From Swiss-Prot:
One of its GO terms (cellular component) is cytosolic large ribosomal subunit. Keywords: Ribonucleoprotein, Ribosomal protein. One of its GO terms (molecular function) is structural constituent of ribosome. This is Large ribosomal subunit protein bL33. The gene is rpmG. The keyword Ribonucleoprotein applies. The lineage of its organism: Bacteria, Bacillati, Actinomycetota, Actinomycetes, Micrococcales. Gene3D superfamilies: Ribosomal protein L33. Belongs to the bacterial ribosomal protein bL33 family. InterPro entries: Ribosomal_bL33, Ribosomal_bL33_CS, Ribosomal_bL33_sf, Ribosomal_zn-bd. It holds the Pfam family Ribosomal_L33. GO terms for biological process: translation.
């Protein structure tokens, strides 16, 4: 059975380059309550760009 409010929810990281490319990952809400921003590789534009958390 799943908990009501999961501590480690599955989130989508969407590219800020506007390509629509996404990564799927999990995050710990207790350690990172804010929206996550990670610099990752976007294969559509073939460079590293910021990926922001989408809910």
């Amino acid at each position: 059975m799943a908990k009501q409010q999961d501590v480690r929810p599955i989130i989508k990281l969407r590219s800020t380059a506007g390509t629509g490319y996404t990564y799927v990952t999990r995050k710990n809400r207790r350690n990172n309550p804010d929206r996550l921003v990670l610099k990752k590789y976007d294969p559509v534009v073939r460079t590293h760009v910021d990926f922001r958390e989408e809910r």
